[in-house]
Structure formats: structure tokens, C-alpha cells
């Protein structure tokens, strides 16, 4: 921990009580993002090195989008290796809020993703594929009819 703390410039390393008493193996079961199979990998990435100079030294999404108070909330995955699902639903909810300037504020269901996106997403609490979760959202959005006006958020 001291070696990590020596390199930290904007944060302080410390022990997290959440993992107190757990073995390394138990902690590793919580890291559920699996390496993606070749057929699932996203297409080629764009590289814009000239834009790297435009990246600010500090950026706090909570301050940049105050109309989206869910940004920065941390959910507890308990003993389930579902970080891949939590990350996907949290970022999708944040993106919906940002895109609509705060008019759509939803907490998407991690449980729904874990229960409904089976083969494409992985193995639930035993790990999964973040790309599969994003593809699942895309399919849902493309195939679902819009909700009636009375149910729209």
C-alpha cells in the first residue's frame, strides 16, 4: 500500500473496511469483468492524439452535470461478481441524464440485466462482459416500443 500511496498525486491510498478479513481469492471473485471473446470485441478505435492536450487536468462529473445527482452514487454489489453489470447500468443511467439535461433521471436495474441478459452478457454473479451489457441495452432500446405517455419518465 505504501508503494501505491507514494505514486498517488490526487488521492490517498488506504485500507477499505469492505474487504477486511477477506482472502485474496474472495476479493478476486468480486472482479467479474471477464476478458471478451474476439467476436464480441468492439470495432477499431479512433485515436485523436491532438485532442489529448484538451483534456483538463481535473474533472469532476458531479460538478459538471449537477442536474444529474445520481452521478457519483456508489452501489454495493455485495458478494456478487457483477461489477460489469453495475458499471453498465450506472453509466447508462448517467448518460441518459446527461443527454436529456437532467429531464430523464432513472436508476436502471442491475438485477434486470443479470437476470435477462444471459448468454450474451456472461455468467451473472460469476462474471460477465461489459460490451455484452451495452449491446443488451441497444437491443432493448431498438426493439421496445415507446412507453405510453402516462409511463414516460
Regions found by a protein language model. Name each.
Residues 1-153:
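Catalytic-core signature of thiol
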Amino acid at each position: 500500500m505504501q508503494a501505491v500511496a507514494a505514486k498517488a498525486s490526487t488521492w490517498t491510498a488506504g485500507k477499505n473496511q469492505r474487504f477486511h478479513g477477506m482472502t485474496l481469492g474472495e476479493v478476486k471473485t468480486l472482479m467479474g469483468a471477464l476478458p471478451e471473446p474476439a467476436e464480441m470485441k468492439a470495432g477499431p478505435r479512433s485515436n485523436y492524439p491532438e485532442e489529448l492536450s484538451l483534456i483538463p487536468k481535473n474533472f469532476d462529473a458531479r460538478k459538471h452535470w449537477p442536474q444529474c445527482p445520481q452521478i457519483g452514487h456508489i452501489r454495493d454489489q455485495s458478494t456478487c461478481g457483477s461489477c460489469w453489470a453495475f458499471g453498465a447500468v450506472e453509466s447508462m443511467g448517467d448518460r441518459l441524464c446527461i443527454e436529456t439535461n437532467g429531464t430523464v433521471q432513472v436508476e436502471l436495474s442491475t438485477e434486470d440485466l443479470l437476470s435477462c441478459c444471459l448468454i450474451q452478457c456472461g455468467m451473472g454473479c460469476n462474471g460477465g462482459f461489459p460490451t455484452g451489457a451495452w449491446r443488451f441495452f441497444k437491443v432493448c432500446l431498438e426493439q421496445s416500443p415507446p412507453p405510453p405517455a402516462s409511463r414516460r419518465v
